[in-house]
Protein backbone atom coordinates (compact mmCIF):
# COMPACT_ATOMS: atom_id res chain seq x y z
CA UNK A 1 0.00 0.00 0.00
CA UNK A 2 2.90 2.38 0.74
CA UNK A 3 4.36 1.73 -2.72
CA UNK A 4 1.02 2.57 -4.37
CA UNK A 5 0.73 5.82 -2.39
CA UNK A 6 4.26 6.80 -3.31
CA UNK A 7 3.75 5.96 -6.98
CA UNK A 8 0.62 8.12 -7.07
CA UNK A 9 2.53 11.07 -5.61
CA UNK A 10 5.33 10.64 -8.12
CA UNK A 11 2.93 10.51 -11.07
CA UNK A 12 1.00 13.55 -9.85
CA UNK A 13 4.27 15.46 -9.56
CA UNK A 14 5.20 14.61 -13.16
CA UNK A 15 1.76 15.39 -14.59
CA UNK A 16 1.59 18.62 -12.67
CA UNK A 17 4.91 19.73 -14.13
CA UNK A 18 3.95 18.73 -17.67
CA UNK A 19 0.58 20.48 -17.43
CA UNK A 20 2.37 23.84 -17.18
CA UNK A 21 4.77 23.21 -20.06
CA UNK A 22 2.64 23.84 -23.17
CA UNK A 23 5.28 26.10 -24.81
CA UNK A 24 7.89 23.36 -24.87
CA UNK A 25 8.07 20.82 -27.73
CA UNK A 26 9.54 17.95 -25.70
CA UNK A 27 10.56 17.19 -22.18
CA UNK A 28 13.29 14.93 -20.80
CA UNK A 29 13.22 14.95 -17.04
CA UNK A 30 15.99 13.61 -14.80
CA UNK A 31 15.76 13.73 -11.01
CA UNK A 32 18.49 12.38 -8.77
CA UNK A 33 16.48 11.95 -5.58
CA UNK A 34 12.94 12.61 -4.34
CA UNK A 35 11.77 12.08 -0.77
CA UNK A 36 8.33 12.26 0.88
CA UNK A 37 6.48 10.72 3.80
CA UNK A 38 5.38 7.89 1.45
CA UNK A 39 8.96 6.92 0.53
CA UNK A 40 11.93 7.78 -1.70
CA UNK A 41 12.75 7.72 -5.41
CA UNK A 42 16.10 8.02 -7.18
CA UNK A 43 17.45 7.97 -10.72
CA UNK A 44 14.11 9.23 -12.04
CA UNK A 45 13.94 9.69 -15.83
CA UNK A 46 10.90 10.78 -17.83
CA UNK A 47 10.49 11.44 -21.56
CA UNK A 48 7.51 13.15 -23.18
CA UNK A 49 7.09 14.66 -26.65
CA UNK A 50 4.78 17.67 -26.55
CA UNK A 51 2.81 19.19 -29.38
CA UNK A 52 0.44 16.27 -29.58
CA UNK A 53 -3.11 16.71 -30.82
CA UNK A 54 -6.31 14.90 -30.03
CA UNK A 55 -5.88 12.95 -33.26
CA UNK A 56 -2.26 12.01 -32.58
CA UNK A 57 -1.52 11.73 -28.86
CA UNK A 58 2.08 10.94 -27.96
CA UNK A 59 3.59 8.49 -25.50
CA UNK A 60 5.26 9.11 -22.17
CA UNK A 61 7.71 6.90 -20.30
CA UNK A 62 8.90 7.08 -16.71
CA UNK A 63 11.58 4.98 -15.02
CA UNK A 64 12.87 5.15 -11.47
CA UNK A 65 14.08 3.25 -8.46
CA UNK A 66 11.69 3.51 -5.52
CA UNK A 67 11.75 2.59 -1.85
CA UNK A 68 8.36 2.97 -0.10
CA UNK A 69 8.38 4.00 3.55
CA UNK A 70 9.12 0.98 5.72
CA UNK A 71 10.96 -0.97 3.00
CA UNK A 72 14.71 -1.61 3.24
CA UNK A 73 15.48 -2.33 -0.41
CA UNK A 74 15.14 -0.36 -3.62
CA UNK A 75 13.07 -1.73 -6.50
CA UNK A 76 12.76 -0.77 -10.17
CA UNK A 77 9.67 0.98 -11.50
CA UNK A 78 8.62 1.42 -15.13
CA UNK A 79 5.59 3.46 -16.21
CA UNK A 80 4.38 4.26 -19.70
CA UNK A 81 1.37 5.60 -21.58
CA UNK A 82 0.98 4.54 -25.19
CA UNK A 83 -1.18 7.61 -25.73
CA UNK A 84 -1.10 10.52 -23.29
CA UNK A 85 -3.45 13.33 -24.27
CA UNK A 86 -4.61 16.61 -22.79
CA UNK A 87 -8.03 17.17 -24.43
CA UNK A 88 -8.78 20.19 -22.29
CA UNK A 89 -7.15 22.22 -19.57
CA UNK A 90 -6.49 20.38 -16.32
CA UNK A 91 -7.54 17.01 -17.80
CA UNK A 92 -5.22 14.20 -18.80
CA UNK A 93 -5.99 10.88 -20.49
CA UNK A 94 -3.59 7.96 -20.41
CA UNK A 95 -4.66 5.16 -22.73
CA UNK A 96 -2.79 1.89 -23.11
CA UNK A 97 -0.86 2.50 -19.92
CA UNK A 98 1.56 0.01 -18.39
CA UNK A 99 3.02 -0.13 -14.91
CA UNK A 100 5.66 -2.62 -13.78
CA UNK A 101 7.56 -2.95 -10.52
CA UNK A 102 8.76 -5.73 -8.25
CA UNK A 103 5.44 -5.89 -6.40
CA UNK A 104 2.93 -4.56 -8.95
CA UNK A 105 2.27 -4.88 -12.68
CA UNK A 106 -0.81 -3.89 -14.68
CA UNK A 107 -2.19 -2.47 -17.90
CA UNK A 108 -4.53 0.47 -17.40
CA UNK A 109 -6.43 3.45 -18.77
CA UNK A 110 -6.48 6.64 -16.70
CA UNK A 111 -8.43 9.90 -16.74
CA UNK A 112 -7.06 12.52 -14.32
CA UNK A 113 -8.52 15.97 -13.68
CA UNK A 114 -7.39 18.81 -11.46
CA UNK A 115 -9.27 22.09 -11.30
CA UNK A 116 -10.52 24.84 -9.03
CA UNK A 117 -14.14 25.98 -9.03
CA UNK A 118 -16.17 28.11 -6.61
CA UNK A 119 -13.30 28.21 -4.13
CA UNK A 120 -12.92 24.44 -4.13
CA UNK A 121 -9.80 22.60 -5.26
CA UNK A 122 -10.89 19.36 -6.92
CA UNK A 123 -8.96 16.27 -7.98
CA UNK A 124 -10.41 13.20 -9.67
CA UNK A 125 -9.03 9.99 -11.14
CA UNK A 126 -10.81 7.20 -12.99
CA UNK A 127 -8.69 4.09 -13.51
CA UNK A 128 -9.50 0.96 -15.48
CA UNK A 129 -7.21 -1.93 -14.56
CA UNK A 130 -6.53 -4.86 -16.88
CA UNK A 131 -4.76 -8.08 -15.81
CA UNK A 132 -3.28 -6.50 -12.70
CA UNK A 133 -0.98 -8.57 -10.48
CA UNK A 134 0.44 -7.57 -7.12
CA UNK A 135 1.99 -8.98 -3.95
CA UNK A 136 3.96 -7.93 -0.92
CA UNK A 137 7.21 -9.25 0.52
CA UNK A 138 5.46 -10.69 3.59
CA UNK A 139 3.14 -12.80 1.43
CA UNK A 140 0.06 -11.42 3.17
CA UNK A 141 -1.49 -9.81 0.08
CA UNK A 142 -1.53 -10.90 -3.56
CA UNK A 143 -3.63 -10.57 -6.70
CA UNK A 144 -3.63 -12.23 -10.11
CA UNK A 145 -5.30 -11.19 -13.40
CA UNK A 146 -7.41 -8.56 -11.63
CA UNK A 147 -9.67 -6.45 -13.83
CA UNK A 148 -11.76 -3.60 -12.48
CA UNK A 149 -12.48 0.10 -12.21
CA UNK A 150 -11.45 2.56 -9.49
CA UNK A 151 -12.85 6.06 -9.13
CA UNK A 152 -11.40 8.61 -6.67
CA UNK A 153 -12.53 12.19 -5.98
CA UNK A 154 -10.94 14.74 -3.62
CA UNK A 155 -11.91 18.33 -2.84
CA UNK A 156 -11.33 21.02 -0.21
CA UNK A 157 -11.56 24.76 0.27
CA UNK A 158 -8.71 26.53 -1.55
CA UNK A 159 -8.12 29.57 0.67
CA UNK A 160 -8.48 28.11 4.13
CA UNK A 161 -7.20 24.99 5.87
CA UNK A 162 -9.86 22.31 5.87
CA UNK A 163 -10.27 18.58 5.79
CA UNK A 164 -10.45 16.96 2.39
CA UNK A 165 -13.74 15.59 1.14
CA UNK A 166 -13.26 12.21 -0.51
CA UNK A 167 -15.23 9.65 -2.46
CA UNK A 168 -14.16 6.20 -3.68
CA UNK A 169 -15.84 3.71 -6.00
CA UNK A 170 -14.38 0.27 -6.72
CA UNK A 171 -15.89 -2.23 -9.13
CA UNK A 172 -13.89 -5.47 -9.09
CA UNK A 173 -14.83 -7.28 -12.27
CA UNK A 174 -12.66 -10.41 -12.33
CA UNK A 175 -9.44 -11.97 -11.08
CA UNK A 176 -8.39 -13.54 -7.78
CA UNK A 177 -7.14 -11.80 -4.63
CA UNK A 178 -5.65 -13.06 -1.36
CA UNK A 179 -5.84 -10.57 1.50
CA UNK A 180 -4.80 -12.35 4.66
CA UNK A 181 -6.76 -14.31 5.81
CA UNK A 182 -9.35 -13.99 3.00
CA UNK A 183 -9.19 -15.49 -0.47
CA UNK A 184 -11.47 -14.33 -3.29
CA UNK A 185 -11.35 -16.68 -6.27
CA UNK A 186 -13.29 -14.36 -8.57
CA UNK A 187 -14.65 -10.84 -8.85
CA UNK A 188 -18.13 -9.41 -9.03
CA UNK A 189 -17.80 -7.34 -5.83
CA UNK A 190 -18.29 -3.57 -5.37
CA UNK A 191 -17.35 -0.96 -2.78
CA UNK A 192 -18.52 2.65 -2.51
CA UNK A 193 -17.51 5.07 0.24
CA UNK A 194 -17.36 8.78 1.03
CA UNK A 195 -16.24 10.99 3.89
CA UNK A 196 -13.51 13.39 5.02
CA UNK A 197 -9.89 13.08 6.07
CA UNK A 198 -7.43 15.30 7.84
CA UNK A 199 -4.20 15.10 9.78
CA UNK A 200 -5.70 13.27 12.75
CA UNK A 201 -8.52 11.11 11.41
CA UNK A 202 -10.47 9.70 8.49
CA UNK A 203 -14.24 9.96 8.74
CA UNK A 204 -16.32 7.43 6.81
CA UNK A 205 -19.73 9.02 6.42
CA UNK A 206 -21.10 6.13 4.41
CA UNK A 207 -19.59 2.98 2.92
CA UNK A 208 -21.27 0.06 1.20
CA UNK A 209 -19.65 -3.29 0.44
CA UNK A 210 -21.46 -5.69 -1.89
CA UNK A 211 -20.17 -9.27 -1.99
CA UNK A 212 -21.40 -11.32 -4.92
CA UNK A 213 -23.81 -14.12 -3.86
CA UNK A 214 -23.48 -13.08 -0.17
CA UNK A 215 -25.21 -9.75 0.34
CA UNK A 216 -24.48 -6.19 1.36
CA UNK A 217 -22.98 -4.43 4.39
CA UNK A 218 -23.08 -0.70 5.11
CA UNK A 219 -20.66 1.06 7.42
CA UNK A 220 -19.81 4.43 8.97
CA UNK A 221 -17.07 5.32 11.41
CA UNK A 222 -14.09 7.41 12.50
CA UNK A 223 -10.52 6.10 12.10
CA UNK A 224 -7.78 7.68 14.24
CA UNK A 225 -4.38 7.84 12.53
CA UNK A 226 -2.21 7.90 15.64
CA UNK A 227 -4.05 5.12 17.48
CA UNK A 228 -4.49 3.12 14.23
CA UNK A 229 -7.99 2.01 15.15
CA UNK A 230 -11.65 2.96 14.88
CA UNK A 231 -12.97 5.28 17.56
CA UNK A 232 -16.57 5.01 16.31
CA UNK A 233 -17.93 2.29 14.05
CA UNK A 234 -21.37 1.12 12.89
CA UNK A 235 -21.94 -1.91 10.65
CA UNK A 236 -25.32 -3.03 9.34
CA UNK A 237 -25.79 -5.95 6.96
CA UNK A 238 -28.62 -6.93 4.69
CA UNK A 239 -29.97 -10.48 4.85
CA UNK A 240 -26.81 -12.50 4.10
CA UNK A 241 -26.67 -15.90 2.43
CA UNK A 242 -24.87 -18.09 4.99
CA UNK A 243 -23.99 -20.76 2.41
CA UNK A 244 -21.84 -18.21 0.54
CA UNK A 245 -20.74 -16.18 3.60
CA UNK A 246 -19.12 -19.09 5.47
CA UNK A 247 -16.43 -20.15 2.95
CA UNK A 248 -15.67 -16.58 1.90
CA UNK A 249 -15.59 -14.73 5.25
CA UNK A 250 -16.28 -16.92 8.30
CA UNK A 251 -14.09 -19.94 7.58
CA UNK A 252 -10.85 -17.90 7.28
CA UNK A 253 -11.61 -16.24 10.64
CA UNK A 254 -12.31 -19.63 12.28
CA UNK A 255 -9.37 -21.53 10.77
CA UNK A 256 -7.71 -22.25 14.14
CA UNK A 257 -10.92 -23.32 15.88
CA UNK A 258 -13.14 -26.39 15.93
CA UNK A 259 -15.51 -24.61 13.51
CA UNK A 260 -13.17 -24.52 10.52
CA UNK A 261 -14.87 -27.23 8.45
CA UNK A 262 -18.59 -26.45 8.38
CA UNK A 263 -21.34 -26.37 5.81
CA UNK A 264 -24.02 -23.73 6.29
CA UNK A 265 -27.32 -22.66 4.75
CA UNK A 266 -30.03 -20.12 5.57
CA UNK A 267 -29.81 -16.38 6.13
CA UNK A 268 -28.60 -14.00 8.82
CA UNK A 269 -28.34 -10.28 9.63
CA UNK A 270 -26.00 -8.36 11.92
CA UNK A 271 -25.80 -4.85 13.36
CA UNK A 272 -22.77 -3.71 15.35
CA UNK A 273 -22.07 -0.38 17.10
CA UNK A 274 -18.92 0.96 18.75
CA UNK A 275 -18.69 4.43 20.32
CA UNK A 276 -15.75 6.18 21.97
CA UNK A 277 -13.64 3.07 21.41
CA UNK A 278 -16.10 0.94 23.44
CA UNK A 279 -18.40 -1.82 22.19
CA UNK A 280 -21.96 -0.53 22.61
CA UNK A 281 -24.34 -3.04 21.01
CA UNK A 282 -24.93 -5.74 18.47
CA UNK A 283 -27.92 -7.64 17.14
CA UNK A 284 -27.61 -11.02 15.43
CA UNK A 285 -30.62 -12.67 13.79
CA UNK A 286 -30.63 -16.10 12.13
CA UNK A 287 -33.40 -17.39 9.88
CA UNK A 288 -33.68 -21.13 9.12
CA UNK A 289 -29.92 -21.65 9.35
CA UNK A 290 -28.40 -25.11 8.95
CA UNK A 291 -24.95 -25.74 10.47
CA UNK A 292 -23.22 -29.06 9.89
CA UNK A 293 -19.68 -30.08 10.81
CA UNK A 294 -18.14 -31.95 7.87
CA UNK A 295 -16.12 -34.00 10.37
CA UNK A 296 -19.40 -35.39 11.72
CA UNK A 297 -19.10 -33.99 15.24
CA UNK A 298 -22.29 -31.91 15.35
CA UNK A 299 -25.12 -30.40 13.34
CA UNK A 300 -28.10 -28.10 13.95
CA UNK A 301 -30.95 -27.69 11.48
CA UNK A 302 -33.45 -24.85 10.97
CA UNK A 303 -31.87 -22.60 13.58
CA UNK A 304 -33.81 -19.41 14.31
CA UNK A 305 -32.28 -16.98 16.76
CA UNK A 306 -32.58 -13.43 18.07
CA UNK A 307 -29.41 -12.51 19.95
CA UNK A 308 -29.37 -8.87 21.08
CA UNK A 309 -26.71 -7.30 23.31
CA UNK A 310 -25.91 -3.84 24.56
CA UNK A 311 -23.53 -2.34 27.06
CA UNK A 312 -26.22 -0.33 28.83
CA UNK A 313 -29.29 -2.60 28.91
CA UNK A 314 -30.20 -6.21 29.71
CA UNK A 315 -31.75 -8.32 26.95
CA UNK A 316 -33.47 -11.66 26.46
CA UNK A 317 -31.79 -14.09 24.10
CA UNK A 318 -33.80 -16.71 22.17
CA UNK A 319 -32.56 -19.64 20.12
CA UNK A 320 -34.50 -22.56 18.64
CA UNK A 321 -33.73 -25.42 16.29
CA UNK A 322 -35.75 -28.25 14.78
CA UNK A 323 -33.15 -31.00 15.03
CA UNK A 324 -29.53 -31.99 14.72
CA UNK A 325 -26.98 -34.24 16.36
CA UNK A 326 -24.03 -34.10 18.75
CA UNK A 327 -21.43 -36.82 18.11
CA UNK A 328 -24.17 -38.64 16.13
CA UNK A 329 -26.58 -38.54 19.09
CA UNK A 330 -29.85 -37.09 17.72
CA UNK A 331 -31.10 -33.78 19.10
CA UNK A 332 -34.83 -33.12 19.02
CA UNK A 333 -36.71 -29.84 18.56
CA UNK A 334 -35.51 -27.35 21.16
CA UNK A 335 -36.25 -23.79 22.24
CA UNK A 336 -33.82 -22.02 24.60
CA UNK A 337 -33.92 -18.69 26.42
CA UNK A 338 -31.25 -16.82 28.38
CA UNK A 339 -30.54 -13.30 29.62
CA UNK A 340 -27.61 -11.03 28.81
CA UNK A 341 -26.52 -8.16 31.03
CA UNK A 342 -23.48 -6.29 29.77
CA UNK A 343 -20.70 -8.93 29.72
CA UNK A 344 -22.59 -11.75 31.44
CA UNK A 345 -25.10 -14.40 30.39
CA UNK A 346 -27.35 -16.38 32.75
CA UNK A 347 -30.06 -19.03 32.48
CA UNK A 348 -31.71 -20.76 35.45
CA UNK A 349 -32.41 -23.91 33.43
CA UNK A 350 -32.08 -25.17 29.86
CA UNK A 351 -33.57 -28.43 28.61
CA UNK A 352 -32.17 -30.13 25.50
CA UNK A 353 -34.25 -33.15 24.39
CA UNK A 354 -31.98 -36.05 23.38
CA UNK A 355 -33.34 -39.34 22.01
CA UNK A 356 -36.19 -40.28 24.37
CA UNK A 357 -34.63 -38.38 27.30
CA UNK A 358 -33.13 -34.96 27.89
CA UNK A 359 -30.03 -33.12 29.07
CA UNK A 360 -31.17 -30.62 31.71
CA UNK A 361 -28.62 -27.86 32.35
CA UNK A 362 -29.00 -25.59 35.37
CA UNK A 363 -27.17 -22.73 37.12
CA UNK A 364 -25.78 -21.50 33.80
CA UNK A 365 -23.60 -18.43 34.21
CA UNK A 366 -21.06 -17.04 31.74
CA UNK A 367 -18.98 -13.85 31.67
CA UNK A 368 -16.62 -12.20 29.19
CA UNK A 369 -13.60 -11.04 31.21
CA UNK A 370 -10.18 -9.98 29.92
CA UNK A 371 -11.12 -11.04 26.38
CA UNK A 372 -11.94 -14.61 27.46
CA UNK A 373 -15.08 -16.54 28.32
CA UNK A 374 -15.52 -17.89 31.85
CA UNK A 375 -18.57 -20.02 32.66
CA UNK A 376 -20.01 -22.71 34.90
CA UNK A 377 -23.07 -25.00 34.92
CA UNK A 378 -24.58 -28.17 36.32
CA UNK A 379 -26.33 -30.90 34.34
CA UNK A 380 -28.39 -34.05 34.65
CA UNK A 381 -28.87 -36.56 31.88
CA UNK A 382 -32.41 -37.85 32.23
CA UNK A 383 -32.80 -41.54 31.52
CA UNK A 384 -32.91 -42.57 27.86
CA UNK A 385 -32.88 -45.99 26.24
CA UNK A 386 -29.65 -47.77 25.38
CA UNK A 387 -31.15 -49.39 22.23
CA UNK A 388 -31.76 -45.93 20.72
CA UNK A 389 -28.31 -44.70 21.76
CA UNK A 390 -26.50 -47.74 20.38
CA UNK A 391 -28.41 -47.49 17.09
CA UNK A 392 -27.55 -43.79 16.75
CA UNK A 393 -23.86 -44.47 17.38
CA UNK A 394 -23.75 -47.50 15.09
CA UNK A 395 -22.89 -49.80 18.00
CA UNK A 396 -24.25 -53.29 18.65
CA UNK A 397 -27.66 -53.18 20.28
CA UNK A 398 -27.52 -52.48 24.02
CA UNK A 399 -30.36 -53.07 26.41
CA UNK A 400 -31.43 -51.01 29.39
CA UNK A 401 -31.24 -47.30 30.08
CA UNK A 402 -28.53 -44.79 30.86
CA UNK A 403 -28.64 -41.74 33.09
CA UNK A 404 -25.98 -39.41 34.46
CA UNK A 405 -25.36 -36.69 36.99
CA UNK A 406 -22.83 -34.00 36.09
CA UNK A 407 -21.62 -31.76 38.94
CA UNK A 408 -20.50 -28.16 38.66
CA UNK A 409 -18.48 -27.74 35.47
CA UNK A 410 -16.26 -24.66 35.19
CA UNK A 411 -14.49 -23.23 32.14
CA UNK A 412 -11.84 -20.54 32.55
CA UNK A 413 -8.70 -19.49 30.67
CA UNK A 414 -9.05 -22.36 28.22
CA UNK A 415 -9.44 -25.05 30.93
CA UNK A 416 -12.57 -27.04 31.77
CA UNK A 417 -12.74 -28.65 35.22
CA UNK A 418 -15.38 -30.42 37.33
CA UNK A 419 -16.15 -29.88 41.00
CA UNK A 420 -17.17 -33.45 41.84
CA UNK A 421 -17.66 -36.75 40.06
CA UNK A 422 -19.54 -37.48 36.85
CA UNK A 423 -21.83 -40.44 37.54
CA UNK A 424 -23.25 -42.73 34.82
CA UNK A 425 -25.68 -45.60 35.41
CA UNK A 426 -25.24 -48.22 32.67
CA UNK A 427 -25.16 -52.05 32.30
CA UNK A 428 -26.87 -52.33 35.68
CA UNK A 429 -23.79 -50.85 37.30
CA UNK A 430 -22.10 -47.47 37.75
CA UNK A 431 -19.29 -45.58 36.06
CA UNK A 432 -17.77 -42.51 37.70
CA UNK A 433 -15.34 -40.03 36.18
CA UNK A 434 -13.16 -38.06 38.59
CA UNK A 435 -10.46 -35.38 38.33
CA UNK A 436 -11.71 -34.40 34.88
CA UNK A 437 -9.89 -31.51 33.22
CA UNK A 438 -9.86 -30.37 29.61
CA UNK A 439 -7.59 -27.90 27.92
CA UNK A 440 -8.83 -26.00 24.88
CA UNK A 441 -11.95 -28.20 24.52
CA UNK A 442 -13.26 -26.21 21.53
CA UNK A 443 -9.90 -25.86 19.81
CA UNK A 444 -8.20 -27.94 17.14
CA UNK A 445 -6.04 -29.93 19.60
CA UNK A 446 -8.01 -30.51 22.82
CA UNK A 447 -6.38 -32.36 25.74
CA UNK A 448 -8.27 -34.31 28.40
CA UNK A 449 -7.14 -35.91 31.67
CA UNK A 450 -9.31 -37.94 34.06
CA UNK A 451 -9.63 -41.03 36.25
CA UNK A 452 -12.46 -43.55 35.82
CA UNK A 453 -14.01 -46.16 38.10
CA UNK A 454 -16.42 -48.90 36.97
CA UNK A 455 -18.30 -50.90 39.56
CA UNK A 456 -20.59 -53.95 39.32
CA UNK A 457 -21.16 -53.81 35.57
CA UNK A 458 -23.26 -56.74 34.33
CA UNK A 459 -20.80 -58.87 32.34
CA UNK A 460 -23.64 -60.76 30.68
CA UNK A 461 -25.22 -57.61 29.23
CA UNK A 462 -21.82 -56.18 28.32
CA UNK A 463 -20.45 -59.24 26.48
CA UNK A 464 -23.71 -60.00 24.68
CA UNK A 465 -23.82 -56.43 23.44
CA UNK A 466 -20.41 -56.64 21.78
CA UNK A 467 -20.69 -60.21 20.39
CA UNK A 468 -17.86 -61.29 22.66
CA UNK A 469 -19.38 -64.57 23.73
CA UNK A 470 -21.03 -64.88 27.12
CA UNK A 471 -19.49 -64.19 30.50
CA UNK A 472 -21.74 -64.35 33.53
CA UNK A 473 -20.66 -62.23 36.46
CA UNK A 474 -19.85 -58.67 37.46
CA UNK A 475 -17.00 -56.42 36.45
CA UNK A 476 -15.02 -53.69 38.21
CA UNK A 477 -12.50 -51.46 36.50
CA UNK A 478 -10.15 -48.56 37.13
CA UNK A 479 -8.51 -46.26 34.60
CA UNK A 480 -5.91 -44.01 36.21
CA UNK A 481 -4.20 -41.00 34.67
CA UNK A 482 -6.17 -41.16 31.42
CA UNK A 483 -4.78 -38.67 28.90
CA UNK A 484 -6.39 -37.92 25.54
CA UNK A 485 -4.90 -35.63 22.88
CA UNK A 486 -7.32 -34.65 20.11
CA UNK A 487 -9.65 -37.30 21.55
CA UNK A 488 -7.09 -40.11 21.08
CA UNK A 489 -5.59 -41.94 24.12
CA UNK A 490 -1.87 -41.38 24.65
CA UNK A 491 -1.50 -42.59 28.25
CA UNK A 492 -3.40 -44.51 30.93
CA UNK A 493 -3.03 -47.26 33.54
CA UNK A 494 -6.10 -49.50 33.27
CA UNK A 495 -7.30 -52.64 35.06
CA UNK A 496 -10.55 -54.61 34.72
CA UNK A 497 -11.38 -57.54 37.03
CA UNK A 498 -14.30 -59.47 38.44
CA UNK A 499 -16.17 -57.64 41.20
CA UNK A 500 -15.82 -58.92 44.78
CA UNK A 501 -18.71 -60.91 46.27
CA UNK A 502 -20.61 -64.17 45.75
CA UNK A 503 -22.47 -64.56 42.45
CA UNK A 504 -22.48 -67.02 39.52
CA UNK A 505 -19.27 -66.92 37.45
CA UNK A 506 -19.42 -68.68 34.09
CA UNK A 507 -17.68 -68.20 30.76
CA UNK A 508 -18.59 -69.59 27.34
CA UNK A 509 -16.15 -71.34 25.03
CA UNK A 510 -16.59 -68.47 22.53
CA UNK A 511 -15.57 -65.95 25.19
CA UNK A 512 -12.56 -68.12 26.11
CA UNK A 513 -11.43 -68.04 22.49
CA UNK A 514 -11.78 -64.26 22.27
CA UNK A 515 -9.96 -63.62 25.55
CA UNK A 516 -7.17 -65.88 24.33
CA UNK A 517 -6.93 -63.76 21.17
CA UNK A 518 -6.53 -60.60 23.23
CA UNK A 519 -3.54 -62.23 24.92
CA UNK A 520 -1.77 -62.36 21.57
CA UNK A 521 0.22 -65.07 19.80
CA UNK A 522 0.94 -67.94 22.16
CA UNK A 523 -1.98 -67.22 24.48
CA UNK A 524 -3.67 -70.49 25.43
CA UNK A 525 -6.63 -71.83 27.31
CA UNK A 526 -5.81 -74.96 29.29
CA UNK A 527 -8.82 -77.25 29.82
CA UNK A 528 -9.27 -80.86 30.93
CA UNK A 529 -9.32 -82.45 27.45
CA UNK A 530 -11.31 -85.51 28.45
CA UNK A 531 -14.41 -83.48 29.24
CA UNK A 532 -13.99 -80.62 26.71
CA UNK A 533 -16.52 -82.04 24.26
CA UNK A 534 -19.27 -82.18 26.88
CA UNK A 535 -19.26 -78.47 27.89
CA UNK A 536 -20.07 -75.13 26.20
CA UNK A 537 -19.37 -73.00 29.28
CA UNK A 538 -17.05 -73.21 32.23
CA UNK A 539 -16.66 -71.91 35.76
CA UNK A 540 -14.02 -69.38 36.72
CA UNK A 541 -12.85 -67.90 40.00
CA UNK A 542 -10.99 -64.81 38.78
CA UNK A 543 -10.88 -62.84 35.55
CA UNK A 544 -8.93 -59.68 34.77
CA UNK A 545 -6.68 -57.82 32.37
CA UNK A 546 -4.41 -54.80 32.74
CA UNK A 547 -2.94 -52.37 30.22
CA UNK A 548 -0.48 -49.59 30.91
CA UNK A 549 -0.32 -47.41 27.79
CA UNK A 550 2.79 -45.34 27.10
CA UNK A 551 4.39 -44.31 23.79
CA UNK A 552 1.73 -46.25 21.81
CA UNK A 553 2.68 -49.51 23.54
CA UNK A 554 0.43 -51.36 25.99
CA UNK A 555 2.20 -53.24 28.81
CA UNK A 556 -0.26 -56.03 29.58
CA UNK A 557 -0.93 -58.19 32.63
CA UNK A 558 -3.65 -60.27 34.27
CA UNK A 559 -4.95 -61.39 37.67
CA UNK A 560 -1.55 -62.88 38.49
CA UNK A 561 1.84 -63.51 36.92
CA UNK A 562 3.55 -66.71 35.80
CA UNK A 563 7.20 -67.32 34.90
CA UNK A 564 6.25 -67.14 31.22
CA UNK A 565 3.49 -64.52 31.25
CA UNK A 566 0.26 -63.74 33.08
CA UNK A 567 -3.11 -65.29 33.96
CA UNK A 568 -6.18 -63.71 32.32
CA UNK A 569 -8.80 -66.25 33.49
CA UNK A 570 -8.31 -68.52 36.50
CA UNK A 571 -10.50 -71.62 36.45
CA UNK A 572 -12.57 -73.08 39.29
CA UNK A 573 -14.38 -76.41 39.69
CA UNK A 574 -14.95 -78.92 36.92
CA UNK A 575 -13.98 -78.53 34.18
CA UNK A 576 -11.02 -76.37 35.25
CA UNK A 577 -9.97 -73.62 32.82
CA UNK A 578 -7.10 -71.17 32.80
CA UNK A 579 -6.37 -68.61 30.07
CA UNK A 580 -2.75 -67.46 29.88
CA UNK A 581 -1.20 -64.53 28.02
CA UNK A 582 2.47 -64.38 27.03
CA UNK A 583 2.95 -61.12 25.12
CA UNK A 584 3.41 -58.37 27.69
CA UNK A 585 4.24 -55.61 25.19
CA UNK A 586 1.59 -55.02 22.54
CA UNK A 587 1.27 -52.06 20.17
CA UNK A 588 -1.84 -49.98 20.92
CA UNK A 589 -3.10 -50.09 17.34
CA UNK A 590 -2.56 -53.86 17.24
CA UNK A 591 -4.58 -54.28 20.44
CA UNK A 592 -7.40 -52.21 18.95
CA UNK A 593 -7.39 -54.44 15.88
CA UNK A 594 -7.66 -57.52 18.11
CA UNK A 595 -10.64 -56.01 19.92
CA UNK A 596 -12.25 -55.22 16.59
CA UNK A 597 -11.77 -58.79 15.36
CA UNK A 598 -13.07 -60.54 18.47
CA UNK A 599 -16.15 -58.31 18.75
CA UNK A 600 -17.00 -58.96 15.09
CA UNK A 601 -16.65 -62.72 15.55
CA UNK A 602 -13.73 -63.12 13.11
CA UNK A 603 -11.27 -64.95 15.34
CA UNK A 604 -10.64 -68.37 16.74
CA UNK A 605 -7.89 -69.17 19.21
CA UNK A 606 -6.38 -72.54 20.04
CA UNK A 607 -8.23 -74.11 22.97
CA UNK A 608 -6.58 -77.07 24.66
Where are each of the predicted segments found?
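N-terminal secretory signal peptides that target proteins for export/translocation
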Residues: 1-4
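Bacterial N-terminal signal peptides
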Residues: 9-18
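Extended amphipathic, helix-rich lipid-handling scaffolds
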Residues: 21-216, 222-294, 303-413, 417-419, ...
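Short edge-strand/loop segments of extracellular domains
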Residues: 426-429, 497-503
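Histidine- and/or cysteine-centered catalytic micro-motif in compact active-site loops
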Residues: 453-457, 495-501
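C-terminal structural cap/anchor segments
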Residues: 480-484, 490-498
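Outer-membrane beta-barrel and related beta-rich outer-membrane complex signature
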Residues: 504-513
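C-terminal structured domain segments
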Residues: 536-578
Amino acid sequence: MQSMRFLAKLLLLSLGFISHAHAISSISLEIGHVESDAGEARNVTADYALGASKAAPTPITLKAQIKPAGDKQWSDLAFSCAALSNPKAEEWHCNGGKLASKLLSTRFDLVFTSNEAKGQQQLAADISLKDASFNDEAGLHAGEKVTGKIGLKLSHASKQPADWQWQADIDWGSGEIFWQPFYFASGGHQFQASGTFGEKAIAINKATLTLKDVGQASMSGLWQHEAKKFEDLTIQTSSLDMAALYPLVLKPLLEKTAYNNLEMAGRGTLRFDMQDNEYKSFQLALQDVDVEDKNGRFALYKVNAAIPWSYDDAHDLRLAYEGGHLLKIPLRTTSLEAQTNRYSLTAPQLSLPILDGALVVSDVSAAWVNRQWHWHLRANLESFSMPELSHALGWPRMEGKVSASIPMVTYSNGYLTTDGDLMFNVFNGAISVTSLTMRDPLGVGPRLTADMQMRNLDLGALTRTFSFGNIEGKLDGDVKDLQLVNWQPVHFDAEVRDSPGRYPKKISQRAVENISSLGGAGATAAIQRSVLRFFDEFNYSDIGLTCRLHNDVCEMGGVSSTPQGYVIVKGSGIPAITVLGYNRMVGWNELLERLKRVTSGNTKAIVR
